[in-house]
Amino acid sequence: MPVRQLFRSGFAFQIPVYQRAYSWGKDQWRVFLEDLVEGQSIGNTYSFGNLLLEDVQTGRLYDIIDGQQRITTMIIFMRAMVNVIKANKYRFRSLSSVNDLERDFIKDRGVVRLTPAPMDAPCFDALIVHNKSVYTATSPSQQNIIDAKDFFTSELMKMQRTTLENIMNYALDAKVNLMVMTGKPEAALMFELQNNRGKRLTTLERLKSFFMYQMYVYSPQADVSSNIASLAGYFSSIYSNLNDLVLIDEDDLLRYHCYAYLGIAFGYRNMDDIVKEFRGAKNKVQWVMDFTYELNQSFINVKALKNIKNVNWDKLVKYHVPPFAYAFIIKGLKYNMNEPAKMADLFELLEKVAFRVKLIGSRADFESRMSDPIRSFQGDVGKLTADIRAKLNDPGSVLYWSDNIFKQRLEGDLYGHGLLHDILWEYEASLLKPKGYTVKQIQIADESIEHISPQTPLDKQGNPLTCYDIDITINKYSNLFIEKYLNCIGNLLLISKSQNSSVGNEPFVDKLASYNSCKLLLQQMEIGAFVSQQPTEWKAVQIEKRRDQIVNFCLGRWKI
């Protein structure tokens, strides 16, 4: 059937609630337009593809089961075509009136040709049906509609009148393979079978279609419509909140939600795990409703993170908020949304855990060890702290995540570690606090890390600097010193790049003078306290002393 016949038949189409919102983007629009431009130039018949419909009102209204992205795009394209023809006052020999094109594809005597999914309807009606020029999007799919209209309008405005007419006719003559079915269960099942066509669906979109289909299968006949409406309402709310997500996308949040609420917790891997838990539910309709309700609440609650003003949340963001932390935050927001002090305690706990995990950097699976704590967490941060502490130090974790492993990592080689600067700034803050200052008041140009005992302990003439821990039998550091002391926290210092360059390989007395003259960083000024008995030397004894002091600070700062 030609596209022109399909639309002149008087059919009206609607997109059922289990369909995804409009998701095509510039790549798909460009291919759509290029196919029309190239096809009309060589004279081949354009295939519009398959269109799978469900008969809702015989001969009048049809649900689109497969092909809704293409139909929506065709109608947006025709709206742009109508606008360009009118703007340029073109007359086409093949078109008696541009109004005919508008009636066929947009609206005819009160009959709107396409009713999109509820979340897209306000935008589509305003921009396409009523041809408004401005609309403020509240979801990614609405923004896609806005951008599609702008794209086609811009591209068509560049074309000559003859090319426009040829493209229009080529689109109208495109062949569409039409299949019509009756019955919602059959239609929903066909949607499941067609769901891998076209642009790949997100997991959230696939989940929506799966849940909608289950409503048809398991709801009592009298409850089908109301259950579908409730589910559609939840997903409409979810999609309306997508633009408010920060740092993560919809599938990330779905994954973190599953960590928080599914029985397998951090064992969740993909949608098959959701389906498996659904299959095991006695009341499947209620299970879907409960899951979707909680998922909607998670999308609503996570919006609060946009406006969170909390130093530990900021640090979590700096650590790229590990997935396990999001799961606890999702549950925390459920129980403590209106309890800022409790949320502050949760952020503090999660920052400590995230820091320790990042510092240790073990390949051992950490998230699975958090499954029991996330299952039992109902907002009590004190209990959660005890649960996590116990998990980190139980027999299954003691070799990977325990307090002792954390201490060993702090005592080891930290040079080049992504958290080294954070550790030294936190240490600086602890030195400033008794004096009533904060690190926010300090700015260092080209921040760098200084090896107090230099990496190359030679003077400008190439002679060994014996003020450092040189093995005099080889005139350089011993392997033991290099492995245990050179890159440990006791030998590392925050410094500006310019100061670092000026003192790099100087004798220790010159370095100490430079540190003492620095009135900006207390960690530089306190170096003298570690060498009061031997002010001309910086060796393993002094490094150990400073290392132990900083490590003890860290053990207290990140104690769980």
Regions found by a protein language model. Give the residues of each.
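Secondary-structure transition/capping motifs at alpha-helix termini
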Residues: 42-43, 84-87, 197-201, 335-341, ...
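Betabetaalpha-Me/HNH-type nuclease active-site subdomain
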Residues: 35-41, 45-60, 96, 379-523
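Short, conserved catalytic or adaptor-binding loops enriched in Gly and charged residues
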Residues: 5-7, 164-171, 304-307, 380, ...
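Secondary-structure capping and boundary motifs in well-ordered enzyme cores
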Residues: 63-70, 168-171, 179-186, 317-322, ...
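A cross-family structural signal marking well-folded subdomains
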Residues: 204-207, 214-426, 529, 533-534
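Glycine- and hydrophobic-rich flexible loops that cap the catalytic core of alpha/beta enzyme folds
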Residues: 1-264, 505-559
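Composition- and surface-driven signal marking solvent-exposed, interaction-prone regions
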Residues: 191-193, 203-208, 274, 340-351, ...
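Generic hydrophobic alpha-helical scaffold/packing signal
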Residues: 191, 330, 347, 351, ...
